Structure formats: C-alpha cells, structure tokens
C-alpha cells in the first residue's frame, strides 16, 4: 500500500474508489494499491 498525496491509475486494471472518505486505488496488481493521505 502506497500512501501518496496524489493517487492515480497506473494501469488499465486500476480502479479509483472512495472508502470512508479516503480516495484509494485498487488493482489486480498488489503493487498498484494506493491510498491518499
């Protein structure tokens, strides 16, 4: 899980979602998981 100020899609499979008021990226590739913070 990468914590970044700016989250963006890295590949086509990445999905930008909002969970508990936090913007997150979920993907089939675990390396692409990101959270805004």
From Swiss-Prot:
Domain of life of the native organism: Bacteria
Keywords, in A-Z order: Ribonucleoprotein, Ribosomal protein
One GO location term (cellular component): ribonucleoprotein complex
GO terms of molecular function: structural constituent of ribosome
Residue stretches in coiled coil: none
GO biological process assignments: translation
Entries under InterPro entries matching the protein: Ribosomal_bL36, Ribosomal_bL36_sp
HAMAP family in the record: Ribosomal_bL36 (MF_00251)
Family as reported in the entry's similarity comment: Belongs to the bacterial ribosomal protein bL36 family.
UniProt protein name: Large ribosomal subunit protein bL36
Native source species: Synechococcus elongatus (strain ATCC 33912 / PCC 7942 / FACHB-805)
Record gene name: rpmJ
């Amino acid at each position: 899980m990468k914590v970044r100020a700016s989250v963006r899609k890295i590949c086509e499979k990445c999905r930008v979602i909002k969970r508990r008021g936090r913007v997150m990226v979920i993907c089939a590739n675990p390396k692409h998981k990101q959270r805004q913070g």
